[in-house]
C-alpha cells in the first residue's frame, strides 16, 4: 500500500511539473500525439502551422546530405533516432578542447562535421584539424522532443524570436526556437558549410539537386511525396504555395518535421498512466530514488525543467555556456538541462561527451560533480551500487521502442556510410590488424571484408597488395595520411567506384 501511494504521489508530481510549464506555452496546433502518456501537444507558433506538406518537406531536408556544401552531412547525420536523437560517433570523435591540444583532459567528444573548405571546394589546412573533418565543440543534443523546448542548443542561444536569416524581418515573435535552431548549422563552416557559404548558395544547390539523391531505403511517405513532387521547387510549392526556396521556409519546414518527433510510448509513459504496476520492483525502487535525488531538474513527462545549471562537468573557464549568451556572470558555466527521455540510447553524456555510460553519470552525481559548482548538493547523492542500478533500470523505462527501432515517425532513409580509410576490419581503429586482414582476403582463402571502401587504403578503386603496402607505410614508415576520409577521420568515400561498404 505504501509503495503504491508513493508511486501515485510521484506520478502526480511529474504530471504537475509538466502542466506548470508546457501547457502554458501551448498555442493552437495539431491534434495531440498518439496515446501513451500525459503529454500536451507541443506548442506551435501561429506563423508556422503544421501541415502534411511541410512535414514531408522538412523530413526530406533533414535527411538530405546535399543540404551540406560537400554532400557529406545531413541534419540526421548527427541526430539518429536509434541513438536517442544524438550521435554515437562522439565516442571516437574528439575536439581538442580549450587548450587546442589533443589528448589532454579537456578534450570534447562531439560530432564530425565538415573538412574546412573554401566554396570552390578546395580544402583548407585547419589549425586544429588539418585536412580532416572538424569536430563540434559540444556533443549533439537530441532533436526528439525539441518541440517542447523554449530555448535550444546547450547554451540556449536559439530563443523565442525567429528572424528571417536573409532580410532580418522578425517572422515569429515568440515560440520560434526550433525554427531559429534549424537554420544555424546550414551555414556553419564546422557543421555543414564551406567557409563563405550564403543562403543563395544553398538555394541554387537545392534547385539543382534531386531530393535525397545520395540516400537509400527511402521511407514510404518520402517515396509517395517524391512521386508527386520530384524536385525541391515542387516540394516547396506544395508546402508553401510557390516554388521559392528561402532560408525562412527551410527553417519552417525543418521545425515542422521536428514537431512530429514526439516520444510518448515508453514503459515510463505506461507508468505515468497506471502507476507502479507498470514497472518491475527494481524499476519502482529506481523511480523513488530518482524522485528523491533528481527533482526538480528532471521532472514532468518531459523529464526536464528547461533550466540552465552548472553542475561541475568541467571548469567554468573551459566553456562559458549560457553566460556567453546572456553576458551575465552568474550564468557562466551553465548548460541546458536535457530531457531524459531515451537517455539510455544517447551515450556519451553531458555537453562535452565526457561520460561514456549511465553508471559513470551516476558516479559523477554521487561525487557531487567533477569540479566545483553551485548546482549540486556538496556531498553528492551517495547512492550505493544496487541503488544506482535501480535508477538506471528506471531510466531505461524512458526508452520509446519506436525511437530505438527507428519506426514511424522516427523512420528515415539510410545515409551514406561513414568510414575510416584503412580500417578494413571496421573496429574503428587503423592498426596492423587491418593490412593483415587485407592479406588474408587476398591470399588466405574466403575472408570477407566488411567495408571494401575502407580497405581500399590507397583509394584507387581496387583491393590489392598495394593497399597493404600503403597501410604499412603509413603505420611504420612515416608515410603521408591516407586519402580522405583518412585514418584520422570519418566520412563517406568521395571517390566513385565499384567498391561498397556494409
What do these predicted regions represent?
Residues 8-21:
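Bacterial N-terminal signal peptides
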Residues 17, 23-25, 58, 484, ...:
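Residue-level detector of intrinsically disordered, flexible termini
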Residues 410-502:
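Cellulosome-associated attachment modules in secreted, modular CAZymes
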Amino acid at each position: 500500500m505504501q509503495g503504491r501511494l508513493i508511486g501515485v504521489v510521484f506520478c502526480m508530481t511529474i504530471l504537475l511539473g509538466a502542466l506548470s510549464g508546457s501547457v502554458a506555452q501551448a498555442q493552437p496546433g495539431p491534434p495531440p500525439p498518439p496515446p501513451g502518456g500525459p503529454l500536451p501537444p507541443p506548442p506551435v507558433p501561429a506563423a508556422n502551422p503544421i501541415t502534411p506538406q511541410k512535414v514531408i518537406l522538412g523530413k526530406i531536408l533533414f535527411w538530405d546530405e546535399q543540404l551540406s556544401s560537400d554532400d557529406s552531412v545531413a541534419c540526421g547525420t548527427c541526430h539518429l533516432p536509434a541513438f536517442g536523437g544524438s550521435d554515437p560517433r562522439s565516442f571516437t570523435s574528439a575536439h581538442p578542447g580549450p587548450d587546442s591540444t589533443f589528448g589532454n583532459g579537456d578534450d570534447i567528444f562531439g560530432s564530425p562535421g565538415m573538412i574546412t573548405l573554401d566554396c570552390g571546394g578546395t580544402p583548407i589546412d585547419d589549425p586544429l584539424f588539418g585536412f580532416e573533418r572538424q569536430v563540434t565543440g559540444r556533443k549533439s543534443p537530441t532533436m526528439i522532443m525539441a518541440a517542447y523546448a523554449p530555448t535550444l542548443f546547450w547554451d540556449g542561444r536559439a530563443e523565442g524570436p525567429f528572424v528571417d536569416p536573409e532580410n532580418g524581418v522578425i517572422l515569429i515573435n515568440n515560440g520560434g526556437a526550433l525554427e531559429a535552431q534549424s537554420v544555424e548549422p546550414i551555414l556553419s563552416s564546422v557543421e555543414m558549410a564551406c567557409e563563405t557559404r550564403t543562403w543563395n548558395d544553398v538555394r541554387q544547390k537545392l534547385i539543382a539537386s534531386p531530393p535525397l539523391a545520395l540516400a537509400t531505403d527511402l521511407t514510404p511517405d518520402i517515396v509517395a511525396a517524391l512521386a508527386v513532387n520530384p524536385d525541391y521547387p515542387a516540394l516547396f510549392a506544395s508546402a508553401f504555395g510557390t516554388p521559392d526556396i528561402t532560408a525562412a521556409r527551410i527553417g519552417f519546414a525543418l521545425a515542422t518535421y521536428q514537431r512530429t518527433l514526439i516520444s510518448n510510448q515508453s514503459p515510463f509513459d505506461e507508468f505515468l498512466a497506471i502507476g507502479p504496476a507498470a514497472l518491475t520492483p527494481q524499476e519502482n525502487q529506481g523511480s523513488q530514488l530518482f524522485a528523491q535525488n533528481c527533482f526538480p531538474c528532471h521532472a514532468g513527462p518531459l523529464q526536464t525543467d528547461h533550466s540552465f545549471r552548472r553542475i561541475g562537468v568541467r571548469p567554468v573557464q573551459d566553456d562559458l555556456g549560457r553566460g556567453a549568451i546572456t553576458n551575465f556572470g552568474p550564468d557562466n558555466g551553465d548548460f541546458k538541462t536535457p530531457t531524459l527521455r531515451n537517455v539510455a540510447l544517447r551515450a556519451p553524456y553531458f555537453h562535452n561527451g565526457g561520460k561514456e555510460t549511465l553508471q559513470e553519470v551516476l558516479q559523477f552525481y554521487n561525487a557531487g560533480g567533477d569540479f566545483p559548482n553551485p548546482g549540486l548538493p556538496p556531498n553528492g547523492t551517495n547512492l550505493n551500487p544496487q541503488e544506482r542500478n535501480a535508477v538506471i533500470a528506471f531510466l531505461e523505462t524512458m526508452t520509446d521502442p519506436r525511437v530505438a527501432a527507428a519506426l514511424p515517425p522516427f523512420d528515415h532513409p539510410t545515409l551514406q556510410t561513414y568510414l575510416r580509410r584503412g580500417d578494413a576490419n571496421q573496429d574503428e581503429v587503423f592498426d596492423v590488424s587491418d593490412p593483415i586482414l587485407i592479406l588474408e582476403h587476398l591470399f588466405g582463402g574466403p575472408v570477407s571484408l566488411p567495408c571494401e571502401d575502407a580497405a581500399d587504403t590507397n583509394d584507387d578503386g581496387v583491393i590489392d597488395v598495394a593497399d597493404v603496402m600503403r597501410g604499412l607505410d603509413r603505420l611504420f614508415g612515416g608515410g603521408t595520411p591516407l586519402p580522405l576520409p583518412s585514418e584520422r577521420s570519418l566520412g563517406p568515400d568521395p571517390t566513385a567506384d565499384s567498391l561498397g561498404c556494409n
